[in-house]
Curated annotation (Swiss-Prot):
Residues 665-677 have a biased composition (Basic residues). The gene is tet3-a. It catalyses: a 5-methyl-2'-deoxycytidine in DNA + 2-oxoglutarate + O2 = a 5-hydroxymethyl-2'-deoxycytidine in DNA + succinate + CO2; a 5-hydroxymethyl-2'-deoxycytidine in DNA + 2-oxoglutarate + O2 = a 5-formyl-2'-deoxycytidine in DNA + succinate + CO2 + H2O; a 5-formyl-2'-deoxycytidine in DNA + 2-oxoglutarate + O2 = a 5-carboxyl-2'-deoxycytidine in DNA + succinate + CO2 + H(+). Zn(2+) 1 binds at C69, C72, C75, C102, H1068. Transmembrane segments: none annotated. It comes from Xenopus laevis. Residues 1316-1347, 1490-1499 have a biased composition (Basic and acidic residues). This is Methylcytosine dioxygenase tet3-A.
Length: 1925
């Protein structure tokens, strides 16, 4: 048996080690020295011994007074294990590796006790049982119980109670062999478990007192049982301790060191033992020796051992010899010999740790539920959570107090030994040598039993089954008695400890009561109990950290009484002889009764001991909420669970350790598992608010109280009779349950019971299960025992449900009230961690053996599984949670009630799972035991059930896919910067004081800022300039919302090197009362570098740059043209490097394998490399300046440099920037860079024009950096107004009286990037369709000539215009789309929208994305494209599908032209309006031409209306297409374009020209142009182009010039095609079709053609159809354009659409440019004289549609001039200067200057230039920044891929679902397409079907209203038309 037990012990040791330290080996090593002492508590089988040993060690450590002894194993260990809690959590744990923590230090801090306890939990559980008697003896001389809990790491334990306990224990301990053991174990126990020794002593004494041999069989059994329970609890504590960095049990304890010393002494080796060096006097009790042996076998060698192997053969041999001799002695004197036995156990390989655990358990009274001061102090000293400290304290106390109950035997070595022997006898029967087992029984047997029980309880089962049989027979009558008997049994069998660990609050109390009874029964039950309670209180306090741990332990104690009876029957009894069993039963009955009473009193006392009973109550309630409703045990377990989770995780790290010390964790897991089960059955997850446990508790409490009273009465009446009766009840249920458990899994049984009983039943079941488990632990049935040991509570709970519910509840009522209260308080205090100690301890009490078993059995990983079968695991975990309850019927009831209570409250307990930066907090834990055995957190493989809400709540992470987890594991976004707070104001109000941040610098005064900057910059005096600014919160801006400046801060002299703007925070006088908001280094980079950069960047970017569309480029209304109207010269912004992407939520290159950070248009690797070199070099040079001037911000930006170096600019280390934006004459409206790094800054390097590089000289045109919300202070930095006035006089500060700027605005609001993208998509889609249809375009072209004739017929509308429209070929658009031309500019004008998108995308830029989307909008006339002849005839117009204009106008050309041309693309102006707009656009240039074009178009389209105006207007009706074109129209010019379109639009020309020419007199066209021109200010042509689908006409007219200019401008923005708009000039001018074609070719050639593309497609859309007609030469262009994707609808709206696009392009730089370009091209094609000039000019002024004005013929020039005159409005923003509080502080950056500001927090802007020209910019701002979330390696490619996988998976799931539901996913995509391309789609059908056109014709003919015109789906589709409607 000894060998078997030693085997178990070693097995246990690993478990214990695991609990102490994740590194099993390390723990094993540590345990060699530490375990001996511990094994006295554990291995001894009697807790007393272990406790004594521990006590000894503790004293030694305390003697060391926190000085490393240097000789213990931990001290000798040089490197951390890397597996323990402290090593694993090095970042948060400030404690030394558990493996390296000096035993003495641990003892002093009680941490060793933790560690020992953890070890002892498993090892000491059994050993402690035997050692308890020894401890008693030892405690006499030394406080072995808990008085020295402080030394035991349970320092927080209440010292008062400890002292009381010590006294009581001392008084008790002296009795009998306690002295003997005291001499032996006391040295060890006191040194190691000085605190626990005392409690153990009383227990031992009690056991010892009673242990007359007959009684002391029972007493011994009781002691053993209780010791085992205590050991379990202790093991849980130890586990918790190990998890929390408590000394590993394996660390050499003082006992171990004494053994080492003695070994060295006897072997004449160099004594490396502790200075204590009482080698000869070293405790040699069997438990201690066995513990030491187990440790030694696990690699714990004497400190000075020189053996090479992992073990010291000599030492092992010596220990074996000692153990043999000790066993002999133990056999000789079963009780007195217990201490010796513990020594022998240690010697005989009984791990001292186990012995110590047993002793500790004995030393730890069950009553110490509440956390004590020791726990608090421990938490502080150990820097661990209070929960952990409580757990440790509880374990410590349990090891001493609970074992104390067992200590009855343990305290007296012989008696505990006998008890242990009885237990061992029963266990040993299985194991072999009962006597050897007796020493081992408590510890080793307990451990073995745990492992065996879990594994099958082979060794223990054999003896257990007999004992259980006899015991059960005896006990069946009285289940309670049986439980009491199992108390010893629990000590001997780890099953009982499991119950003890499992016991929940009430159960715990019951266990305490039972413990008290046991204590009394052995000797003076009440006295012993009181003594135990004293220590127990301390320990319980400690344990109370985790009510589960302690409660379980306590419950186990009580339940041990109850369950011990059962357990004794099952385990101890089986091992014990019948006499011993009987004795134990009798003793247990009396003892239990007394113990219950004492425990109740003690509990009351304990509750008072709590720091805050209310808080504790709240905590307890919380825990209960958190705890599973099944049993309060579970709550306890859950309390333990939380710590267990951590521990389990850590244990998982070292599975071996997991096996050894996971017991506490598995119990908690078991508890969790049961909780889920209970929750499942009892709505565990119900919201805490919904869970009303009070009623349930009240009922249960009443029942429990009644039951307790009954039990107490029965106990008081008869030790056995009452106990037997209660036990018989409990036993009946518990045994039945046990039997069931034997056959059925504990979980199953428990679940069944719980399901049937509800929460209360569940609780009872848990208790019963725990009880039955306890019995089972003693039972020989392997599975049963295993289940019992793992989930003894579960079985007990089942039994309890059957029989013990009532009695258990009775006890529970009292215990429940008190214990629950305590638990609640504790929970409130510690939350879920509270469960840790309780769970742990209880689980170890009940699962101590299970732990071992767990180590042996994978199921043990599951909280309960280790002891339970897979099924049993679930139920038993509950029981396990409340082993004490399980042991006691009352305990069962209590446990059940507690569980129920806890279950209801359990929701308050939270489960925290974290993966990477994501932490999932759930209120419950539904874990299958399998899951819990692994992590305490279910894993996918461990999912106990199908995915459910409860399952997800239980462990959300387990339901995540690996890709999702990988995403989750990615670092979370950095939290927003937290800046220093102050007490100056109640709450910082940034609205009043301005943004608050300090990373640029701050100080209490302005003078401090000067000092700060002088220190940073290295110069003083005039070199540093401080300017105070005042935050007003009133933004200075023009009436149109554009930036203005009221004060300009300039560099005063060469001496001034650095200028800082500081803000005094209103109402602040703190250290951050003044903050720096801007730093300007006037000489940031060398002058030469600045000069070269200016020229290089200008040349490269102007040619190849790809403008970036930025929202800040426009005012709020998106109608300003602050960047300039000429797409060729307008200001633009170019982005390089890495920047943040909303799509990726990280770097925009996330999916780029080979990102081009300096991407230029086309394939220009050399240019890109050139830019790369320049910017990288500049970033490298700017970074040091940034670091010098703003070190904190710099550091913030380089934090993640190493990780995300791919997203950084710079050639040297120290790369704060990720990207750079080059702003060339770009006016940035007031904005904040919201996506910048939250605690970083932007660094702006300014390069200025040659005329602005001299200090003191103010250039004609300059750009200022403005802070719109600030005003300049009236005083200088020194508070002097005179000084400020002097600065103003010298020019340092320029005070402006006005800020005159030309008011430039777009015809219509520019589209957002999103809109443009959508439009582009639509346009692209339409374009494709049109292209397919346009295969017929040649015919159209032929027809277009006819149309052209018609257009010619209309002198007002030149055919050329139509041709230009034709020229606006989709190909051109496509080319422009390709950015053949200077796409950058045009795209910019389009704001990149047009250009990036298809020509159609250009169209998309326009409101009428369908038309714009299809430059073939003429396709709207698309009918034309389809119908080579202007099928516009269907409008009743001749094939002059100029009729489209008419039909667009729906017959009311006049009305529409006037309305539409005039101003309302949206209104769908009449042809006249359009014509007027066109005329205006063309100005005087070709009013006639425009009309002619209009007339031509109308004729061409429909001869019907010689009054081209109407036709033209109709064309403008077609304009609706342009209106679609309005996507281009989106551009400010959009409306204008519309207006112009009637006159100029090539598309309109075919239709409108005929109409407009006829209906519109040149005057009308002119007026249209004129109206357009005003809008042209932003882009006259664009406007006209936009407004006129027929715009070609208007564009061809004078509008052509101005319109082209505008168009070009927009085109430039939108696309280089705008430049080609200049080509469109020919449009205005009469240009042969060939010429037009050439123009078109030119425009295509230009990148900006993209805008034109839209133009050709947009403008020509109708022309496309009309192309054949192409209104003459324009027809060709139109054909091409139509071939370009011009949707039929677009064609329908052709004239308008085309010119609309064109116009729009100019007006909407980003969106309209293509259109404008097309229009321009069309116009160029048009033989308009102005068109010709325009053509020339357009090519020249391609970027400046407005420049077309200059290039246009006089007529056009005039019209353009008119347009300009109208648009050339200047504003001085007077109102801003009338209010002093309106802000507008500007800084005039110098050449090479570096400006640093927090752009993310401060509103900033740059003023518009009078004449922006990015080709020769007045200022180039190189803005270096770091966007947020650019912290992933390789641009976040891995994250992106993971995301894609996730999306793909989702898509797959959706597909499967769709397939399952029979839904076609295509429908969704189609729907989406319809959404964005609905118009296009609609248009496309018209394009495809002439019928559609006829329908339109009919509509058009029938009605003049836009609505009628748009009766077609096209109208709706063209969205833009809706405007007109």
């Amino acid at each position: 048996m000894m060998e078997t037990q030693p085997t178990s012990l070693p097995h246990v040791l690993p478990q214990d080690v695991y609990e102490f330290c994740d590194d099993r080996k390390s723990l094993g090593r540590l345990r060699v020295s530490e375990m001996p002492a511990e094994s006295n508590g554990d291995g001894g089988g009697s807790k007393g011994d272990g406790a004594a040993v521990v006590a000894k060690e503790v004293p030694e450590q305390s003697n060391k007074k926190r000085k490393r002894c240097g000789v213990c194993v931990p001290c000798l260990r040089k490197e951390p294990c890397g597996a323990c809690y402290n090593c694993v959590n090095r970042s948060t744990s400030h404690q030394i590796c558990k493996m390296r923590k000096c035993e003495q230090l641990k003892k002093k801090r009680v941490v060793p006790l933790k560690g020992v306890e953890a070890v002892n939990k498993d090892d000491s559980k059994n050993q402690a049982k035997e050692q308890v008697p020894n401890v008693k003896n030892c405690s006499e001389s030394i406080l072995v119980d808990g008085p020295k809990t402080d030394q035991m790491e349970a320092g927080p334990v209440n010292h008062v109670q400890e002292g009381r306990l010590k006294k009581e224990c001392d008084s008790t301990l002296p009795s009998k062999a306690c002295e003997d053991l005291a001499n032996q174990l006391l040295m060890e126990a006191n040194s190691w478990l000085s605190n626990t020794a005392a409690p153990q002593d009383p227990c031992n004494k009690l056991n010892w007192d009673k242990p007359t041999i007959p009684n002391h069989t029972a007493a011994t059994n009781n002691s053993n049982l209780e010791d085992a329970k205590n050991l379990v609890a202790f093991s849980a504590v130890a586990e918790a301790m190990s998890n929390y960095g408590m000394p590993a049990s394996g660390t050499p304890s003082s006992v171990s060191m004494q053994l080492y010393e003695k070994f060295n002494y006897e072997t004449n080796r160099d004594s490396s033992g502790h200075p204590e060096g009482n080698a000869p006097s070293c405790p040699e009790d069997l438990n201690t020796l066995k513990t030491a042996l187990a440790l030694a076998k696990h690699g714990v060698k004497p400190p000075n051992c020189n053996c090479d192997g992992p073990e010291c053969p000599d030492y092992l041999e010596w220990l074996e010899n000692k153990i043999k001799s000790s066993q002999k002695d133990s056999q000789e004197s079963s009780f007195p010999g217990l201490g010796q036995v513990s020594k022998e156990l240690v010697q005989k390989s009984y791990p001292k740790e186990e012995v110590l655990n047993l002793e500790n358990k004995n030393l730890c009274p069950s009553g110490n539920l509440p956390f004590s001061q020791n726990a608090l102090s421990l938490a502080k000293e150990k820097n661990i959570s209070l929960q952990t400290a409580i757990a440790i304290e509880a374990l410590t106390q349990l090891s001493s107090a609970l074992p104390q109950t067992n200590n009855e035997c343990p305290n007296s070595s012989s008696q505990p030994l006998i008890n242990t022997c009885d237990q061992l006898t029963h266990f040993p029967t299985a194991k072999g040598n009962q006597l050897p087992i007796f020493p081992m029984a408590c510890n080793e047997l307990f451990q073995n039993q745990q492992s065996q029980l879990y594994t099958g309880k082979n060794a223990l089962p054999v003896p257990q089954s007999p004992r259980q049989t006899s015991w059960e027979q005896n006990k069946k009558p009285s289940y309670q008695e049986g439980q009491y008997i199992p108390e010893n049994l629990s000590q001997s069998s780890s099953v009982l400890p499991s119950d003890a660990s499992t016991p929940q609050k009430t159960e715990f109390l019951q266990q305490w009561i039972q413990n008290a009874d046991l204590l009394k029964s052995p000797s003076d039950p009440m006295t012993g109990l009181k003594q135990l309670l004293g220590n127990t209180d301390e320990y319980i306090k400690s344990v109370f950290k985790g009510p589960e741990a302690l409660p379980n332990k306590i419950k186990h104690v009580k339940t041990k009484r109850t369950i011990k009876s059962i357990k004794k029957k099952s385990s101890d009894f089986l091992k014990m002889s019948p006499d011993q069993q009987l004795s134990q039963l009798l003793q247990e009955n009396d003892f239990h009764h007394n113990a219950q009473a004492a425990l109740q009193q003690h509990l009351h006392h304990k509750r008072n001991l709590f720091v805050d009973p209310n808080t504790m109550e709240a905590c307890a309630q919380e825990q209960q909420n958190w705890w599973v409703p099944k049993s309060q045990k579970l709550p306890v377990s859950k309390t333990t669970e939380n710590p267990v989770k951590e521990r389990k995780k850590r244990r998982q790290r070292s599975p071996s350790q997991k096996q050894v010390e996971p017991k506490p964790k598995p119990p908690r897991k078991q508890v969790q598992i049961k909780k889920p089960r209970m929750k499942e059955g009892n709505a565990v997850f119900m919201p805490v608010s919904q869970i009303s446990l009070d009623a349930f508790r009240g009922a249960e409490k009443e029942e429990n109280q009644l039951k307790e009273m009954n039990l107490e009465k029965s106990l008081s009446n008869n030790i056995q009779p009452d106990l037997l009766e209660s036990q018989s009840i409990l036993v009946t249920g518990s045994q039945a349950n046990i039997e069931n458990r034997k056959t059925v899994n504990t979980q199953e049984t428990c679940n069944e019971n719980q399901a049937s009983n509800g929460k209360a039943s569940n609780f009872a079941l848990c208790v019963n299960q725990a009880n039955s488990l306890g019995a089972k632990d003693s039972c020989p049935t392997p599975s049963t025992d295993d289940a019992s040991s793992s989930s003894g509570q579960g079985d007990s709970a089942n039994q309890h449900t059957n029989v013990g519910d009532v009695p258990g509840q009775n006890d529970l009522s009292c215990l429940d009230d008190k214990f629950e209260d305590l638990l609640r308080q504790f929970e409130a205090e510690f939350g879920e961690d509270f469960s840790l100690p309780g769970s742990e301890a209880p689980s170890q009490n009940g699962v101590g053996p299970p732990k071992q078993q767990i180590s042996g059995d994978p199921q043990f990983k599951m909280p309960f599984p280790s002891q339970l079968l897979p099924s049993e695991n679930s139920t038993r975990p509950d029981a396990h949670s409340n082993p004490a309850l399980s042991n006691n019927p009352i305990s069962h009831n209590v446990s059940h009630n507690l569980d129920s209570l806890f279950s209801s409250k359990s929701p308050k307990k939270i489960k925290i799972e974290s993966s990477g930066a994501i932490t999932v907090v759930s209120t419950t834990c539904f874990y299958s035991e399998e899951n819990q055995h692994l992590d305490g957190t279910p894993t996918k493989s461990d999912l106990p059930f199908n995915p459910t809400l409860s399952g997800f709540l239980e462990s959300p992470l387990k339901y995540l896919t690996s890709p999702t987890k990988s995403l989750i594991d990615t670092p979370a976004k950095m939290a927003q910067a937290e800046f220093p707070t102050c007490d100056c104001v109640e709450q910082i109000n940034e609205k009043d004081e301005g943004p608050y941040y300090t990373h640029l610098g701050s100080g209490p005064t302005v003078a401090s800022i000067r000092e700060l900057m002088e220190d940073r910059f290295g110069e003083k005096g005039e070199a540093i300039r401080i300017e105070k600014v005042i935050y007003t919160g009133k933004e200075g801006k023009s009436s149109r919302g554009c930036p203005i400046a009221k004060w300009v801060i300039r560099r005063q002299s060469e001496d001034e090197k650095l200028m800082c703007l500081v803000r005094q925070r209103a109402g602040h006088h703190c250290e951050n009362a003044v903050i720096i908001i801007l730093i300007m280094a006037w000489e940031g980079i060398p002058r030469a570098l600045g000069d070269s950069l200016y020229s290089d960047i200008t040349e490269t970017i102007t040619k190849y740059g790809n403008p970036t569309s930025r929202r800040c480029g426009l005012n709020d209304d998106r109608t300003c043209a602050c960047q300039g109207k000429d797409p060729n010269t307008c200001g633009a912004s170019f982005s390089f490097g890495c920047s943040w992407s909303m799509y990726f939520n990280g770097c925009k290159y996330a999916r780029s394998k080979t990102p081009r950070k300096f991407r230029l248009i086309g394939d220009n690797p050399k240019e890109e490399e050139f830019l790369n070199d320049n910017f990288q070099d500049l970033a490298t040079k700017v970074a040091p300046v940034y670091q010098m001037l703003a070190p904190q911000s710099y550091e913030n930006q380089v934090n993640n440099e190493e990780v995300a170096i791919d997203c950084r600019l710079g050639l040297k280390e120290g790369r704060p920037f990720s990207g750079v934006t080059a702003c060339m004459d770009f006016c940035a409206h007031a904005h904040k860079d919201q996506h910048n790094l939250y605690n970083g800054c932007t660094v702006v390097c300014t390069l200025t024009k040659e005329d602005n590089r001299t200090i003191g000289r103010i250039p004609e045109d300059e750009q200022l950096h403005v802070l719109p919300l600030y005003k300049v202070s009236s005083t200088d930095e020194f508070g002097s107004e005179d000084g400020q006035a002097e600065k103003i006089r010298k020019g340092g500060i320029q005070v402006l009286a006005s800020f005159p700027r030309e008011v430039r605005k777009l015809s219509e609001p520019a589209k957002s990037c999103r809109q443009r993208q959508l439009d582009a998509k639509k346009a692209a889609a339409e374009k494709k369709k049109l292209q397919k249809e346009k295969l017929v375009s040649p015919d159209k072209t032929k027809q277009e000539p006819a149309d052209t004739k018609m257009c010619q017929q209309n002198p007002g509308v030149p055919q050329q215009q139509t041709k230009p429209c034709v020229k606006v070929e989709p190909s051109n658009h496509y080319n422009t789309y390709k950015y053949n031309g200077n796409g950058v500019v045009e795209s910019y004008s389009v704001l990149g929208s047009c250009r990036p998108s298809d020509p159609y995308s250009m169209n998309s830029v326009y409101s009428y994305h369908s038309f714009y989307a299809q430059p073939n909008l003429p396709s709207v006339n698309g009918f034309h494209s389809k119908f080579a002849l202007p099928p516009f005839g269907f409008y009743g117009f001749p094939n002059n599908p100029v009729v489209p204009n008419q039909f667009m106008n729906y017959g009311t050309s006049d009305a529409r032209n006037s309305g539409w041309m005039n101003n309302s693309f949206e209104k769908k102006p009449d042809v006249q309006s359009l014509a007027d707009g066109m005329n205006q656009s063309y100005g005087s240039e070709l009013p006639e031409q425009s009309y002619r074009r209009s007339s031509e178009v109308p004729h061409h389209y429909s001869l019907q209306n010689p009054n081209s105006q109407k036709s033209f207007n109709i064309s403008h009706r077609t304009t609706p297409s342009p209106m679609e074109t309005t996507p281009y129209s989106n551009l400010p010019c959009y409306n204008k374009v519309i207006k112009k379109e009637p006159v100029c639009d090539p598309l309109v020309d075919p239709f409108q020209r005929a109409n407009s020419v006829h209906s519109q007199s040149p005057g009308v066209n002119h007026s249209l142009q004129t109206s357009d021109l005003p809008f042209k200010a932003n882009g006259a042509l664009p406007s006209s182009g936009r407004s006129n689908a027929e715009g070609p006409c208007s564009m061809s007219l004078p509008n052509d010039k101005s319109g082209l200019e505008k168009r070009d401008y927009f085109g430039v923005h939108s696309n280089v095609p705008a430049l080609k708009d200049k080509q469109w000039t020919p449009y205005g001018t009469d240009v042969p079709v060939g010429q037009r074609d050439s123009l078109d070719a030119q425009s295509p050639g230009k990148v900006w053609s993209s805008c034109k593309l839209s133009d050709s497609p947009a403008v020509l859309p109708s022309f496309a159809s009309t192309q054949t007609k192409n209104w003459n030469g324009r027809q060709a262009s139109l054909n091409q354009g139509l071939k370009e994707p011009m949707p039929f609808q677009e064609k329908l709206w052709n004239s308008v659409a085309a010119s609309d696009r064109c116009s729009v392009t100019p007006s909407d730089r980003s969106s309209v440019t293509p259109c404008a370009e097309l229009q321009d091209k069309n116009w160029a094609s048009f033989p308009n004289p102005v068109g010709n000039s325009l053509k020339t000019e357009s090519s020249q002024n391609h970027w400046d549609p407005y420049s077309l004005d200059d290039n246009m013929d006089d007529g056009q020039s005039k019209s353009v001039k008119e347009e300009e005159d109208e648009e050339e409005i200047w504003s001085d923003s007077e109102h801003n200067f009338l209010d002093k509080n309106i802000g507008g502080v500007a800084v005039a950056p110098g050449h090479g200057s570096i400006l640093i500001e927090c752009a993310r927090r401060e509103l900033h802007a740059t003023t518009p230039l009078k004449k922006p020209n990015r080709c020769h910019p007045a200022r180039i701002s190189l803005v270096f920044y770091q966007h947020k979330n650019l912290n992933q390696p390789n641009h976040g490619l891995a994250l992106w891929e993971a995301k894609m996988k996730l999306l793909a998976e989702r898509a797959r799931v959706k597909e499967e679902e769709a397939a399952r539901l029979g839904i076609k996913q295509e429908v969704k995509s189609l729907g989406k397409k319809r959404k964005w391309g609905g118009a296009a789609t609609t248009e496309t059908p018209p394009v495809e079907k002439k019928d559609f056109i006829p329908t339109r014709q009919a509509t058009t003919i029938l009605t003049d209203s836009a609505t009628t015109a748009f009766s077609y789906a096209y109208t709706k589709v063209t969205g833009p038309y809706s405007r007109f409607i």
